[in-house]
Amino acid sequence: MLHDHPSVGPTAILTQFGAIFVSLELSRSNWVLTSLSPGNGEKMSQYSLAAGDIGGLLARFAELKRKAKERTGSDYPIITIHEAGLDGFWVHRVLQNEGIDSYVVDAASIATSRRRRRAKTDKIDGEALLRALLAFKRGEPRVCAMVVAPSPEEEDRRRLCRERQTLIAERIIHVNRIKGLLFAQGISDYVPLRRDRRKRLEGLRTGDRRPLPVHLKTQISRELDRLELLLDQIRKVEAEQEALLAAESKAAPEGEPHNAVAMLLAVKGIGEHSAAILWSEGLCRQFSNRRQVAAYAGLAATPWRSGAVIHEQGLSKAGNPQLRTTMVQLAWLWLRHQPQSALACWFRARGERGRKGSIVALARKLLVALWKYVTHGVIIEGAVMKPAA
């Protein structure tokens, strides 16, 4: 689609176009469009729209196509790019439904100036996005990282796991707040998650044998109200998650591959919550190799090798945080429930030195092994399966 050819002019781009290229700089207040059209002197044009004005956006695209046809006598398709961010994927889906070739890019993967104080405007960002799109369509390697947009069903399916994690984090906050308030009064044995929490609150005495102050007791009572609401919501979310897993893990029809959720649940040491996160956050997607799997979870290494300087910077963490956290937790559980597996033996052979780094390496190896197991049916060496129900 793109062919190099000489051009004149200091701001001309050395490319012959077979399409109209548009970058979208999205924000809460307005959208900035940067376009590059055939027959327009190879100059970038910019337009501004109100945020969310999808009708105005499509009208602008129609105008760009009309002007390009007037100049060249040919119809050209539109190719767009915008950063993954606050707007999610709804704009991308609208454009695809309109027959527009749309790309979503990881903003952190686009090269920028490394000066400590660099200019940053919507105009500069829009032009940088457009240059990245042109290079990507020319087939240049490592230009940027395009995001694979999930389907609406995939996006909705992972809501339950994420909502549960949010509720658990809020529960921890309330429990710690209650414990902190009471510890300041010399009370260290109160457990807010016990069923008799209300009854025990009435009988509490401070470290100097006084009844709880009135306002403190009232505050803790309100904290318990919020805590109990959270506990009820967690139970409801977990019930929905169990129902979804039950539907996903039903036996596949004869002649079809086994269901991935059922395969994960069959492995000893993997429970319903871990299986739900593994499937909805990672293993439901398509990967070409193990490096892509590790990179998607943010478990890939980041070496620094320049001349005589060679060292490791640690994990990139440029990936799915829910999947990464779950895999590190699952790695510890794997050592407990699968001590005779090849992965556990590999971990023990490394000894106590570098235990923190080793558990992350085990998490990476385990994720790759589970991916091979789910997608290709490769049994994890030495792994024990749960007994059939």
Regions found by a protein language model. Give the residues of each.
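A detector of single, family-specific signature residues
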Residues: 1-389
